[in-house]
């Protein structure tokens, strides 16, 4: 059996787009699942679209996602070069072979000596192939006019170069977007003209936006580049997980899957024909689930490295403080930069009460006494989580306050919020000075009623 070998062949037009990342990922999953090879080739012959640094950016983001390759422009290999701009002599050689067999012809521009080369489309022929996702697809040659394979500047057309490269690089399977379906009959013609064996094609479903329209780079409300997610602190394994599910339904009881689990589960028979929906809420959920699996100190190290939280005065033992802070909010975190939102929510220097909190103070006359009690207790204790928790327990058991009222008054009084995470650890991180300041402010407001 021929060894399975697939490729991802981007143009260096900028950052790695989520659609292209999905294409790379499906090729990678298929190769790994079948102990095959995954390679990278750069299609850079359209210089007007190339962006400086685009190639390096794409490769960096693929590696960040957890995708590796055995051949490519950065590591070379036995079938290079791996940039189309460095393979022009190869394309010209094969174009000449078609000219020699009268399977192509020169087309001169009027008044010029330069010419393009067009492929002669066979007349009255049917071209069919078995798509691994969509089944048998058929095209008639009369629907296609003679097409350019080599431009007058000596550069190949996409459909010509891709066939030459895929054959010479021994590509066995091609996973790509459904927009390439119409290119396939032209490519089949070229394969047949050279009497080369066809690779197997799999045309993946479209990715739709929330309005069920094809995802476009003009969709400003959707972040569309992998680098944007990396900068916000999404985990690569979570993006890997999310992108893998855009058009693939694994045979699994859970959608929260590691890269290795997705490799093991990947099955072409379970690739969908129906369009996939880009659901940001689902991505946030998956990232949250992957974040929950990490130790707080791992997330804390990343947050410190990325400098998401730029504090004017950092707490003593900042990494230890950050680890505790992460532990407090880890279950609520959709991405790591969100730590700044949690900090701003609770660690504000100027206390402020919401309308809801103010209403609670107005309608619960016990609040003032509860707040005074906690102020007096917190003023004299060592401000550590276990000591704080024990002090709260003592106030609860030694006084006749209604429990629900007591705990709500405690949370409002110490944090100026109606809701929040574990109170004892939160108060330790806020620090005694801020907690007493909050209590004084809320007491002052409560005494007005």
Swiss-Prot record:
UniProt short sequence motif 'KMSKS' region, positions renumbered to this chain: 214-218
Chief localization: cytoplasm
Sorted UniProt keywords: Aminoacyl-tRNA synthetase, ATP-binding, Cytoplasm, Ligase, Nucleotide-binding, Protein biosynthesis
Keyword Cytoplasm in record: yes
Motif 'HIGH' region positions after renumbering to this chain: 10-20
Top EC group: ligase
Catalytic activity: tRNA(Glu) + L-glutamate + ATP = L-glutamyl-tRNA(Glu) + AMP + diphosphate
Protein family membership: Belongs to the class-I aminoacyl-tRNA synthetase family. Glutamate--tRNA ligase type 1 subfamily.
Known partners and oligomeric status: Monomer.
Function of the protein: Catalyzes the attachment of glutamate to tRNA(Glu) in a two-step reaction: glutamate is first activated by ATP to form Glu-AMP and then transferred to the acceptor end of tRNA(Glu).
Name of the protein described by the UniProt record: Glutamate--tRNA ligase
């Amino acid at each position: 059996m021929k060894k399975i070998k697939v490729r991802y062949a981007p143009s260096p037009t900028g950052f790695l787009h989520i659609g292209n990342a999905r294409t790379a990922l499906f090729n990678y999953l298929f190769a790994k699942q079948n102990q095959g090879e995954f390679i990278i080739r750069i299609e850079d012959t359209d210089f007007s679209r190339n962006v400086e640094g685009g190639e390096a950016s794409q490769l960096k983001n693929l590696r960040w996602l957890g995708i590796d390759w055995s051949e490519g422009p950065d590591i070379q290999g036995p079938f290079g070069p791996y940039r189309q701009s460095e393979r022009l002599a190869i394309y010209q050689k094969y174009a000449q072979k078609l000219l020699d067999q009268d399977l192509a012809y020169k087309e001169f521009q009027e008044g010029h000596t330069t010419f393009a080369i067009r492929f002669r489309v066979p007349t009255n022929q049917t071209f069919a192939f078995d798509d691994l996702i969509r089944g048998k697809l058929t095209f008639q040659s009369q629907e296609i006019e003679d097409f350019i394979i080599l431009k007058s500047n000596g550069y190949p057309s996409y459909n010509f170069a891709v066939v030459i490269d895929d054959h010479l690089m021994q590509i066995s399977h091609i996973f790509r977007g459904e927009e390439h379906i119409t290119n396939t009959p032209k490519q089949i013609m070229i394969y047949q003209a050279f009497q080369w064996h066809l690779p197997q094609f799999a045309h993946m479903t479209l990715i739709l936006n929330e309005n069920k329209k094809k995802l476009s780079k003009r969709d400003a409300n959707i972040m569309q580049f992998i680098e944007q997610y990396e900068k916000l602190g999404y985990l690569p394994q979570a993006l890997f997980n999310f992108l893998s599910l855009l058009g693939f339904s694994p045979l699994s009881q859970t959608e929260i899957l590691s890269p290795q689990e997705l490799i093991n589960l990947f099955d072409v028979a379970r690739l969908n024909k129906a369009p996939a929906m880009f659901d940001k809420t689902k991505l946030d959920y998956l990232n949250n689930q992957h974040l929950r699996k990490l130790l707080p100190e791992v997330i804390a190290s990343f947050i410190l490295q990325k400098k998401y939280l730029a504090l004017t005065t950092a707490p003593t033992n900042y990494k230890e403080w950050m680890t505790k802070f992460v532990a407090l909010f880890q279950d609520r975190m959709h991405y790591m930069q969100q730590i700044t939102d949690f900090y701003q929510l609770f660690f504000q220097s100027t206390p402020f009460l919401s309308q809801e909190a103010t209403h609670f103070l107005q309608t619960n006359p016990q609040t003032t006494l509860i707040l005074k009690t906690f102020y007096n207790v917190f003023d004299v204790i060592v401000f550590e989580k276990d000591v704080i928790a024990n002090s709260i327990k003592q106030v609860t058991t030694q006084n006749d306050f209604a429990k629900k009222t007591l705990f709500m008054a405690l949370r409002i009084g110490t944090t100026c919020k109606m809701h929040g995470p574990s109170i004892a650890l939160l108060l330790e991180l806020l620090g005694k000075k801020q907690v007493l300041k909050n209590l004084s402010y809320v007491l002052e407001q409560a005494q007005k009623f």
